[in-house]
Amino acid sequence: MPILSIKLPTGHPEEKKRTLLDGLTRAVTDSIAAPLKTIRITIDEVPVANTIVAGEIGQPNVIITVAMIAGRSEQQKADLIAHLSRAVQDCVGISIDHTRVLIQDYPITDLGVAGGITAKASGR
């Protein structure tokens, strides 16, 4: 049930963004075995001039926020972070050193799923 929001510098062609979406999806399925039908990913593009890394304005970087149901192990989360970071580097060429992944765990009572019900009500 992972929901990913990616902050990506503007300027990448649509084909690269599609490749990134596919790569991120594979990263999620490969690392935490989430069912494909439960994965949601959106790209939010940010002008490079609106970013700063280590005091340097305009340094390309990627921030990925992952919202998911609590319960994954520390190792699964580490694998997810590694897979997502590699997917960014492989798909759009932004260094793994300039990618950050933030994981937010939600209890099953605090996350809505298909049908407008909580994950708990859906049987998760």
Q: Whereabouts are the PLM-identified features?
A:
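A domain-level signal for the structural core that forms small-molecule/cofactor-binding pockets
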Residues: 2-124
